[in-house]
Swiss-Prot record:
Binding site for substrate: K163, S192, R249
Site (Important for acyl-CoA specificity): G111
Keywords, alphabetical: Acyltransferase, Amino-acid biosynthesis, Cytoplasm, Methionine biosynthesis, Transferase
Protein name, per record: Homoserine O-succinyltransferase
Alphabetical list of HAMAP family matching this protein: MetA_acyltransf
Amino acid sequence: MPIRVPDELPAVNFLRNENVFVMTSSRAKTQEIRPLKVLVLNLMPKKIETENQFLRLLSNSPLQIDIQLLRIDSRESKNTPTEHLNNFYCNFDDIQDENFDGLIVTGAPLGLVDFCDVVYWPQIARVIEWAKEHVTSTLFVCWAVQAALNILYGIPKMTRKEKLSGVYLHQTLQPHALLTRGFDETFLAPHSRYADFPADVIRQHTDLDILVASEQAGAYLFASKDKRLAFVTGHPEYDVLTLAGEFFRDCDAGLDPTVPVNYFPEDNPELEPKASWRSHGHLLFVNWLNYYVYQITPYDLRKMNPTLD
């Protein structure tokens, strides 16, 4: 079954052009199926691009999914039309009394910003605390992982001296875990961050299971034993040209960025890169939806019984 989205959302035509089955809300109402309710807190500046990336991965599942987009930054956006935000996004006050099967919190370009200087830090803390009682399973991506580790476990912000950018080799540490079911023993995934996630720090300060790690990128995928929390420190949702766009943007800004590792053919930015992580990204999201959301969420969300302390 497909994802359910508002009829006029730009992602509808974008994904249909890729032969992705998208069901508009008007058509979905004719089916007597209880869809999974998934809330997406989109923290990225280019919201439409990020919507397309995540909805692509969420659509590759036999489950029908009702997507609700959430924003917590009330400032005027420089990268997304106000009309789009008004038409397709809700504010936290609109949904705070609702329950959801899943929540995805995206990354944000805040790698070198102290938590106390993040304008919407109180709001993101509120959402994460709210999710304990209102969401079956939450998936944090990249910067959101760092924020959640601080809010939930008190782990301070850790940053690298140089930005981690490129496509890195990862090792599946727990191949029989539900979230890694079907993963190759080694696979590639993109990263673009200053945040540092040393596996030993996560083991020392949390009870999370580290499922996948990388010698260069550190802990990549980890989760709580009750499946309520999942963390991915990279960007499996990225399009093939996303890293290139970031690299050339930084070049134009005079930042002299390092060429992303293992990305451009022959490390030559003039050559077009190829995506080597698509199958992994799809499998990760299908596993999360199936094993962490669908199989443990109640049919009646009013009867949600959270297990997270």
